Structures are given as C-alpha cells and as structure tokens.
C-alpha cells in the first residue's frame, strides 16, 4: 500500500507549479495506493474520482470553512490536505482540522522543516484528529529537525509518512528514516513514494528497497500496508 502518490494530466487540468521534467506520461501504476490531490486549478477531485483509485486525500481550504460533511460523504475521500508549506495558515485552519475528527478523516500536513514548531502546536490543539506528516517535514539537515521530529512524535495523534526524502535531502537518507522509525515507532510510520515527483531523483524500486531494508520482517506488514489501512480507514486485503 503506497500511502502517497499523485495522478495528474496537464491536458485536463492546470498545474502551474509542475516542472517540465514531470510534464510527460509515466508508467502505469499497479498496486494499492492513496492518491493525494496535487493542487490543480479546477475540479481535480471529480477527475480523480473518475479514475476510481482506492482512496483519495482531497484538497480542502480549511481556513474558509468548507463543507466537510459533504466532502466526507464522497466514498473515495479518506483524508484531507490543505497545503501549509509556504503559508502562515496554522491558526486559520485549526478549527477545520478539529472538525475533521468529527467526520473520521485524517489531516495530511505538508510542511517544511522550519514549520515543524507550528505543526507541533497544531497537533496538540487538535488532539482528536489524526495528523499525517508528509515527507517527514521536508528536512534539510538532521539538526534541528531531529529534536523537532521527536517533539512532534510526542503527540500520539500524529503519524509519519516515510516519503519524499530524495527530493529534499542531499546524500544518505537512511539516518532520517531511522530517526523517524525510532521516535514514532514502526506502528505510526507509513510507506509512501511521492510518485511521480520522486522520479526526479530516484526510481520507485530503489525507494521501496531503501525503506524496506530498514524494517524487520515483523515491521514490514505495518509500515508497507496495515498502518495506511488503519489511518485511512481502508479494508485489509
């Protein structure tokens, strides 16, 4: 179960941020996955629903008090993301993040390392909502990220996606993955590829091998499948 992939088609929807290197067809995906909205302009959610993935993490502007009840009623929507990277919306989205708990939806938090202190405060204020940290908080260096991640992990409502590191970290990514596994525990870590963004720096097989190589036999079932099923309310296969 890949807990973080993107689908897009620039001929259908507009993605102003998408680099030219990613504006081409990629290989077909075969497997179970959670598809995360890629912040296109237009009705991206309806387009994704027509593709019939197993689960969608839908974009929602939580600071604008969207109709979360209607969003939760869409069968494929299993989580919500409001991109916080590059914003100062943590206070503005707080009530929306809290409301997600009432609808049984987790919140995917995509932030950068410098925003970890704000996410720590948000997680504490929204302790009934499951918060999914995307890409380990996009670290740039082990310190001060290491201490900040440990503090965030102290909030038991937070889980961590082992995803997206190769486009953020220069050099060996294993110390970052090892630290995340240590502070969160394998039962609160989810494998994600961030595909096809990750294709800029690695292959799918290489990333899966790196993550799998750090897990014991007993940990693999959780990190590679069962934890994502639990967090996003999916049926076990």
What does each model-identified segment do?
Residues 1-3, 18, 24-32, 179, ...:
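Mid-to-C-terminal alpha-helical segments outside catalytic/metal-binding sites
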Residues 1-103, 114, 141-143, 209:
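Mid-domain alpha/beta scaffold segments of enzyme catalytic cores
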Residues 1-8, 12-13, 92, 96, ...:
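A generic "structured core" feature
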Residues 4, 56, 100, 135, ...:
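Conserved, mostly hydrophobic/aromatic
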Residues 6, 39, 137, 165-166, ...:
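Catalytic metal-binding/acid-base residues of hydrolase active sites
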Residues 75-78, 154, 218:
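Structured loop/turn residues at beta-strand edges in well-structured enzyme cores
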Residues 90-190:
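Catalytic pocket-lining loop regions of alpha/beta-barrel enzymes
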């Amino acid at each position: 179960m890949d807990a973080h992939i993107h689908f897009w088609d620039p001929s259908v929807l507009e993605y102003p941020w998408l680099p030219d290197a990613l504006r081409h067809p990629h290989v077909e995906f075969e497997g179970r996955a959670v598809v995360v909205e890629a912040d296109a302009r237009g009705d991206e959610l309806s387009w994704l629903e027509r593709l019939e993935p197993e689960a969608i993490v839908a974009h929602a502007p939580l600071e604008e008090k969207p109709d979360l009840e209607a969003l939760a009623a869409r069968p494929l929507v299993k989580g919500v993301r409001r991109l916080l990277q590059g914003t100062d919306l943590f206070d503005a989205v707080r009530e929306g993040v809290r409301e997600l708990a009432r609808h049984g939806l987790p919140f995917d938090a995509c932030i950068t390392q410098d925003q970890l202190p704000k996410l720590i405060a948000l997680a504490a204020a929204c302790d009934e909502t499951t918060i999914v940290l995307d890409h380990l908080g996009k670290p740039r260096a082990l310190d001060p990220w290491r201490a900040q991640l440990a503090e965030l992990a102290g909030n038991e409502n937070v889980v961590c996606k082992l995803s997206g590191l190769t486009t953020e970290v220069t050099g060996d990514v294993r110390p970052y993955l090892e630290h995340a596994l240590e502070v969160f525990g394998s039962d609160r870590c989810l494998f994600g590829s961030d595909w096809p963004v990750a294709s800029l720096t690695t292959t799918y097989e290489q990333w899966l091998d790196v993550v799998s190589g750090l897990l014991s036999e007993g940990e693999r079932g959780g990190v590679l499948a069962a934890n994502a099923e639990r967090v996003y309310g999916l049926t076990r296969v």
